[in-house]
Amino acid sequence: MADAKELTKRFDNTMLFEKEKDMLDAFLELVQDADILSGWNSEGYDIPYTVGRIQKVLSSDDTRRLCFWGEKPRKRVFEKYGREQLSFDLVGRVHLDLLELYRKYTYEERHSFRLDAIGEHELDERKTVYEGSLDNLYKNDFGLFIEYNRQDTALLAKLEKKLKFIELANEIAHQNTVLLQTTMGAVAVTEQAIVNETHRRGMQVPGRKYKKDGEENQPAAGAHVATPQKGIHDWIGSVDINSLYPSVIRALNMGPETIVGQIRPVITSAEINRAKHAKKSFAAAWDSQFGSWEYQAVMNQEKGTGIIVDWEDKTSVRMSAAQLYEIIFDGNNKWMLSANGTIFTYEYEAIIPGLLKRWYEERQEMQRKMRDCGDNEIEREYWDKRQLVKKINLNSLYGAILNPGCRFFDMRIGQSVTLTGRCITKHMASKVNEVVAGHYDHKGESIVYGDTDSVYFSAYKTLQKEIKEGIIPWTKDSVVALYDKIADEVNGSFKSFMTKAFHTPSTRGEVIAAGRELVASKGLFITKKRYAVLYYDKEGKRADVDGKDGKMKAMGLDLKRSDTPVFVQDFLSDLLYMVLQGKDEKEVLEKISEFRSEFKSRPGWEKGSPKRANNMTKYTAAEEKAGRANMPGHVRASMNWNRCREMYGDKYSMPITDGAKVIVCKLKQNPLGYTSIAYPVDEMRIPEWFKELPFDGDAMEATILDQKIDNLIGVLGWDVQSTETTNTFNKLFEF
């Protein structure tokens, strides 16, 4: 004890206790003045562990000291990664798991969410390293044990100081009048914001609708994603619509209280069912459709197509599509028609569009104040946090109201947003092609790709003759100026289009606005949702500075996928950059050959594929019961690791549990009959028994390298196979 006291003196604010009872008692006294308790994975570990120790060492009654008003922590079982876990909710005292906050607000998947990995990524600082088990560290090096625990706490404090996620949650809670814990979701926050706006206007909120027994929630048609013109394209420009879905809601004044009627989707349902019978997916059924079939009939003023309109007063009327067009577009009613066939009124402003408008204006004002702060960093941070809350509110509203659990859920509104958005984006692409190539066509020669709220185009091919003759100047600057003019012309067309397509008054139609986003020297388009461009101008800000050609924007590629090792991600990123710089086939293939040699020289365990081992408990139990159960390959590989740990008597390596991130390695033929084995990403010391396994380097090269190279540049048709180096002599003697 004397040695421990001397060691403790080396550290500030560190208390030494002889008994756990005294330590827990002091902890309970300290937290009395704490508003928020936090930790890293504290929901699943620290909270249940601490409650359990207090119950065991002190008493069950002492757990009340974690709560207010003499209440005990309330037990809660939740499922995570396929396994039930125990936690406790502290009554009156707020607990926020910093790991869950980090996952929620970083919007990116990481190879590891271990505190050590996140500390290194965000702070360039890691946990204290030690050998052996934590129990051995406690017994044999108490000074390092103290340092280890202090560093964990320091990392948490530094992460919050930098990221301010608890502050952000607090700001969201206050602005939307919800509990801090409620901010971990999106639906309840949005719902309460709508309720608050309703009450602010002196109105009442309608009762919650409940689903009838046996009633199933039907999916809504999603955004339109065009099939790209595959391959390399020069001089790419992109135009995108500002906040498409919130703007659509505002433009058509969409709210439960402004719905006048709905065209019964008889034809649409029949067409979707026909597609399903033809083995098409729901998304494929809508692939080339830019509105419900009934909406298209109305816009075509088809006299021979009969439709039924269900009015909100519970009456229905049968008429021709042409008659409804006349009622809405040529009548005196203040009605608008969405691409879903939903009729909205604009006689008064609906709650949800009004709220979106206010949030949008408030965010603009906050951003202005942030810019006006000058060198006042404290004031800048204050306004930055507040504008970020508005951004989160704006981005989450559409998803929340389309969630069946939301009080304001209405499928008619949800599908009106997506289908109307499709029509607007189709018009944008058509108008771009009209300006560039002379004809109004969303699949025209200048259109390279389109996705949800954006269109990618190139005027280079269309204008090549004029460029060669010197009629049209073609430099980086002139292309920026040209593409800005194209975007301006497109933007100026929305007001009249909105009136023509949906009967919106001009004041509402002008809500839809687009701007030129990128100008890129080259782009590689592979398939839907998978493309990359090397841009040198983004919204007027140049990226080709400091000797760089520009910056890459890559979507849906293996460059950032969590199932791709980091060193392979880096290689693929370099490879893509070469392609977008215009390097020829020979140079790119040489780069691949060099990396293959490097890949082959790596240890076998570094060539595996990252995965997440969900439902380990479930599949382990099934295996024990049935002898051999069906399961995903990476789960069996994880199970093989756990078995080998036991077989080799390995007490130091960590087991693979539910939700663990793992690296899956393929194996050659072996006495155990294993085709693969995994190991935990967070395992800092690979055991010797594992290193001696017969790893199948060729098989892993095919999975982790060949397949991903093909995914990236296979569309170019280059001879990548020529870069493969195999030992032909050894192959001859394989049986």
Predicted regions and their residues:
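Active-site-proximal helix-loop-helix substrate-binding element of RNase H-like nuclease domains
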Residues: A4-E18, L37, I47, K56, ...
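Glycine- and acidic
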Residues: T8-N13, V31-I36, Y138-L144, Q175, ...
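Short glycine-rich phosphate-binding loop at a beta-alpha junction
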Residues: D35-E43, V448
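Catalytic nucleotidyl-transfer cores of nucleotide-processing enzymes
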Residues: V77-V91, Y105, D213-R407, K528-M552, ...
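Active-site palm subdomain of RNA-directed nucleic acid polymerases
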Residues: K127, T425-T452
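Common nucleic-acid-contacting/processivity interface regions adjacent to the catalytic cores
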Residues: D135-F282, E377-K431, Y449, S458-Y460, ...
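Catalytic palm subdomain of template-directed nucleic-acid polymerases
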Residues: V455-I486
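C-terminal, non-catalytic extensions of nucleic-acid polymerases
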Residues: Y483-F735
